[in-house]
Amino acid sequence: MLLIWAVQGWSALAKARKLKNPFPATPAALAAGIEVYTNHCRRCHGQYGDGRGEKAAELSVAPGDFTNASKMNRLTDGELYWQTTYGRRPMPAFAHKLSDEQRWKVVDYIRTFAASKR
């Protein structure tokens, strides 16, 4: 899914950058984020969030690498949420597939990939 070429220069709308995640990264939120990621993101973004999922080689654009702390730290939660919501080929939009809550919680979870590299 996701998420994101954000880490590769995909810019969100200015107002999206200011959005705040209403779901703190609690153990319950992260567990919900893991479920969403596993079901919708992992095939492209990979088990470890490194953009090396089983479908990655088939895509015209490499999936975002969420393990790159430098790039991930430059993105706001609002930008990641926006990119997940609206997508950009080949990544699908998830506005009608996932609830707002699910999209925010997957943002919480993908943040853990870069955090584990510090």
Language-model features, listed with the residues they occupy:
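Sequence/structural segment immediately N-terminal to covalent heme-attachment motifs in c-type
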Residues: 26-50, 80-86
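C-terminal capping alpha-helices of c-type cytochrome domains
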Residues: 8-9, 81-89, 95-118
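Electrostatic cytochrome c docking/interface patches
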Residues: 10-36
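Short cysteine/histidine-rich zinc-coordinating motifs and their immediately flanking basic loops
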Residues: 54-58
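Conserved beta-strand positions that form and line the central face of beta-propeller blades
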Residues: 22-23, 48, 65, 90-93
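Bacterial N-terminal signal peptides
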Residues: 1-4
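Short, non-ligating residues that shape and space the ligands of small metal-coordination modules
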Residues: 50-51, 100
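Electron-transfer interface patches adjacent to heme c in soluble/periplasmic c-type cytochromes
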Residues: 63-78, 94-103
